[in-house]
Amino acid sequence: MSRHRIVRTMDYNDEYDGYDDIYGHSVEDEHCISPTDAQQWLYDRARGQQSISAFISKNKDIQEEEADEDEDEDAAFAKARRDSESFQMPQLDEIEQAKLSSCVDEVRSVVGDAVSERRIVETSMKFDYDMQKILDEILNEETNKSAKPAVNKMKAPAAPVLPKTVSKTVPTPPPKISLKEPRRGFEIPSPKVPSSPVVSGRNTPVDISAGDDISRSSATVFKVSKEQAVRNARQLYEKERADQKSHIHMIVIGHVDAGKSTLMGHLLYDTGNVSQRVMHKHEQESKKLGKQSFMYAWVLDETGEERARGITMDVGQSRIETKTKIVTLLDAPGHKDFIPNMISGATQADVALLVVDATRGEFESGFELGGQTREHAILVRSLGVNQLGVVINKLDTVGWSQDRFTEIVTKLKSFLKLAGFKDSDVSFTPCSGLTGENLTKKAQEPALTNWYSGRHLLDVIENFKIPERAIDRPLRMSVSDIYKGTGSGFCISGRVETGVLCLNDKVLVGASREQAQVKSLTMNEFPQTCVFAGDQVSVTLPALDINNVTVGCIISDPQTPIPVTTRFQARIIVFNVKVPITMGFPVLLHHQSLIEPAVVCKLTASIHKSTGEVVKKKPRCLGNNSCALVELETSRPICIERYADFKELGRVMLRVAGVTIAAGMVTKIR
């Protein structure tokens, strides 16, 4: 009851003190707008405002942008076309009509569609069908139109009005202005100025200004030795390699678990490149893990992670010798997560070996949409590989069935023909990588010899043609690996794409074009004095900033350096894409071993796949199986060549979200 007494004796006036007070906001919140803003922006009839322009009189005019030249040309072309479509020929007699028609045809053959039909007819009748006068009139008019200077429509800002001041002027001598010629990136001083033989370009900006001619990027000529400048590469090659076997690089591709590593491991063992002791060790270790069928695969899969997961993750290299060739085997990963590694290996290959699994259901899963059999074949063809050997592996799991072999061959033949391979450059070989049947000698299995009497796998490799090497071209070497050597400096591993490289040669490295001198050359762990196009070598470059060298950069000849740019035009073929390619579409650009983010900054034209004719200018998007000219822009400067100049360095691949969406050739460098 005590709490009831407290309520009865409560003074309510004390409790309501401050009840009507306002807390939590300022006095300005009671007004929706300040008086200054209201005076500037609200309409006041008393002030006599007559137009909306009074509200924005103090604001600057919005400057209009000039129209794009391409848009002006397209608009003029469209106007001329509409003029021609709406124009009707004048009514003339037969003779006059024949003269007029012949004049129009002859003028069209000279000027094309750039001039409207109305203009041609009027000019023809004006000069009484005199072709010389008609062409002079039309061509002079077109020349005058194109020669008009562009007028800048943007007005210059008005000069501020300053108050007049009266001051006593003191005569002063005119200031001396020293005019220095602007120095472009990577220019070397005159020979009169003493300079170090090794020029560091780590603080030198890269000259990536756009130009119409690619030779602008090679305008700067670096000093090289007299021997390097006058070297005859062809004579040197014949002197060094005349009595040696030809060298060829072969990449082994295919769907995951098709048996690529097992096939190559067994081939190496049968050819004597793997000792019995090493093979016995792999056999015992694989037995302990319950993976005895992987013992041949472990010859190439050397890392613990690859052996634990049972898949190849990086490109493994090995070497075999045939009667006439030295073959470098490149074992590519088959899993789709490691496609970038496969592309890096395929850029080094001359020929390819496609391994397919003949097991029921396995071939279908690898060949259907999303399988790596199809994607790998398209990738190697897009990267310039023309010769392909198809190995139908694990045919023993289906009892060496001829029907299964014929079924797989029929499906692959039609697909490979569409991918761009010639029938004469493709061969099909049945074998078993685990048992070694039909690898290095003729088949002995009766179930196979009943219907197959063709070549074994080693004979197929022996019959691959050696591609022509571009030895006479300037030096271009793509970098695939960088590591610390045993001596001073660090080593760069890569493939010599074109030209020749010798000891003590001076080279330019990457987009920075830092100059360095070759200290040592090794190939297959043997020292060399000269290496040539097609060789996989390691180069030691002392006194070089390692920050200027990255995987994917190009080593070039100082006399003809490789172009460096951030924007180029390419002719691409679009594969299956889920989202159409539009302007601003982000992609991953694959060029040799380089992986660089890029953007499709312009869709120039859609072109016909076979003829190359322009189907449509400036398309809005690119869909499946289309061919187009596009412009790509990278975030950093890269070294790249036109396909017409260097086929080896003019190919690019575009990938998005782990899927290859397009392949193309570089046609123009900005």
From Swiss-Prot:
Its main location: cytoplasm. Residues 60-88, 164-202 are annotated as: Disordered. Residues 245-468 form the tr-type G domain. One of its GO terms (molecular function) is GTPase activity. Disruption phenotype: In germlines, increases transposable elements transcription at both mRNA and protein levels. Results in male sterility: male testes are morphologically normal but no mature sperm is formed. Results in defective meiosis and spermatid individualization during spermatogenesis. Gene3D superfamilies: DNA helicase RuvA subunit, C-terminal domain, P-loop containing nucleotide triphosphate hydrolases, Translation factors. Belongs to the TRAFAC class translation factor GTPase superfamily. Classic translation factor GTPase family. PANTHER family: TRANSLATION FACTOR (PTHR23115). This is Protein HBS1. The gene is HBS1.
